[in-house]
Amino acid sequence: LPLYNFGL
């Protein structure tokens, strides 16, 4: 689970 998944 990526921390920087702002809508990716």
UniProtKB/Swiss-Prot annotation:
The keyword Transmembrane helix does not apply. The modification Leucine amide is found at L8. The keyword Transmembrane does not apply. GO terms for cellular component: extracellular region. Its main location: secreted. It is found in: Secreted. GO terms for biological process: neuropeptide signaling pathway. It comes from the Eukaryota. Keywords: Amidation, Neuropeptide, Secreted. Belongs to the allatostatin family. This is Cydiastatin-6.
